[in-house]
């Protein structure tokens, strides 16, 4: 399949020059009745407040960063882009209401977001009914993207990442046998846990698990219970503030145990929240390597605007805008419609900041994973992609 040069790549460096977008200042394409090129409006769903606000702000900046770059180069086939971002507060019900608002607005050509798999799954019926793409930077539930041809995600799936955690981090890298798991009581965390347990059983791991409700602050009873089984590792499956709270409360109780988490990625906010950040290990499908000039420049540019270092999440948000732009480029001089964007998006092959972005028939991305940890209050790669090269 034909690949297209990326305007994002051109803005960054020649290292990403094969990928997302070409012909950005072309004069062909759909026009308004007045003969002028229409502005393509996108709807953004992001948790700008609440437990996931760090990620929501990252979405907001990543979306706008890409749009500003595209528009500065004349748009795509002359079409400029704009985005309206709604605060979903990390709540699936709020997200569904806002997705409906976007879907009912005929000027909105595609929806970018939401952050959680639960919210994206709740919106799947809505986007399917209205025939509008919902492209999530981060939804990782294995059953999300195949809910509708209009559902897409680029984060990767928990039926790959969670088994990687069991086999490569716990069994192979740490040599652990007895595992304590504390997880959020949510659809996303249940998917993580179920896929983790399937591989953990194959690896012969002895797992004890407990869950907690959203908004829980006091984890002392769970920590006491888990400590009593004398595990080798404490694993937390969550993406919000509870990750730091659980590990910090374990530290405060005097529990000296290896910390592992599935969900937060390489979050700078998490490092700042933890009392013993150097004791944490996570999985990640992407890392901002300081030795990679292209990625380093992107990260520095993001940090200047955001005030914090980026994780994969805002980079995926940035890539999502370019994926839509690439779809518009592929439509060429045809009419820009929701269905045309869906079809072009499904058929495209791309290279973004976060790597290869080639959709499976289900509408998600196959990712590889690495092991990351903290040294001297900075994230580092402990084992690269090759660590799981033999597969699960």
Regions found by a protein language model. Name each.
Residues 102, 106-115, 135-137, 178-183, ...:
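Periplasmic-binding protein-like
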Residues 247-318, 373, 385-390:
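Extracellular/periplasmic periplasmic-binding protein-like sensory domains
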Residues 54-77, 194-201:
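Short, polar/charged alpha-helical segment
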Residues 35-36, 40-64, 86-93, 115-116, ...:
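Extracytoplasmic "Venus flytrap"
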Residues 304-314, 325-379:
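Segments of small-molecule ligand-sensing domains
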Residues 1-41, 72, 387-392:
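Short, low-complexity disordered leader/linker segments with a strong preference
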Residues 28-31, 54-59, 73-144, 154, ...:
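Beta-alpha junction/loop-to-helix N-cap segments that form part of ligand/metal-binding clefts
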Residues 97, 141-143, 149-254, 288-289, ...:
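Extracellular/periplasmic Venus flytrap/periplasmic-binding protein
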């Amino acid at each position: 399949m034909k690949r297209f040069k990326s305007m994002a790549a051109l803005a960054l460096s020649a290292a990403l020059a094969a990928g997302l977008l070409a012909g950005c200042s072309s004069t062909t394409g759909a026009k308004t009745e007045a003969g002028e090129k229409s502005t393509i409006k996108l709807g953004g769903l992001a948790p700008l407040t609440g437990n996931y606000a760090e990620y929501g702000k990252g979405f907001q900046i990543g979306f706008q960063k890409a749009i500003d770059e595209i528009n500065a180069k004349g748009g795509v086939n002359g079409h400029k882009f704009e985005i309206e971002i709604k605060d979903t507060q990390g709540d699936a019900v709020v997200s569904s209401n806002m997705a409906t608002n976007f879907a009912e607005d005929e000027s909105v050509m595609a929806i970018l977001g939401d952050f959680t798999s639960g919210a994206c799954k709740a919106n799947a019926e809505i986007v399917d009914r209205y025939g509008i793409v919902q492209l999530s930077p981060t939804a990782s539930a294995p059953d999300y993207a195949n809910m509708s041809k209009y559902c897409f995600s680029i984060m990767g799936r928990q039926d790959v990442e969670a088994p990687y955690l069991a086999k490569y981090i716990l069994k192979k890298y740490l040599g652990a046998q007895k595992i304590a798991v504390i997880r959020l009581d949510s659809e996303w965390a249940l998917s993580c846990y179920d896929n983790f347990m399937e591989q953990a059983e194959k690896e012969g791991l002895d797992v004890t698990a407990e869950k907690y409700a959203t908004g829980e602050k006091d984890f002392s009873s769970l920590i006491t219970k888990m400590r009593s089984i004398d595990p080798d590792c404490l694993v937390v499956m969550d993406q919000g503030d509870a990750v730091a709270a659980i590990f910090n409360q374990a530290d405060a109780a005097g529990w000296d145990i290896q910390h592992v988490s599935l969900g937060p990625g390489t979050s700078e906010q998490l490092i700042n929240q933890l009392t013993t950040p150097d004791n944490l290990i996570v999985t990640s499908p992407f890392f901002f390597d300081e030795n990679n000039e292209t990625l380093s420049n992107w990260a520095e540019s993001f940090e200047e605007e955001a005030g914090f270092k980026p994780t994969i999440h805002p980079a995926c948000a940035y890539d999502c805008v370019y994926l839509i732009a690439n779809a518009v480029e592929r439509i060429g001089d045809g009419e820009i419609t929701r269905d045309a964007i869906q079809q072009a998006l499904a058929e495209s092959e791309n290279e973004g900041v976060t790597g290869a972005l080639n959709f499976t028939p289900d509408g998600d991305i196959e990712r590889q994973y690495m092991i990351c940890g903290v040294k001297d209050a900075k994230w580092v790669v402990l084992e690269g992609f090759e660590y799981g090269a033999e597969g699960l």
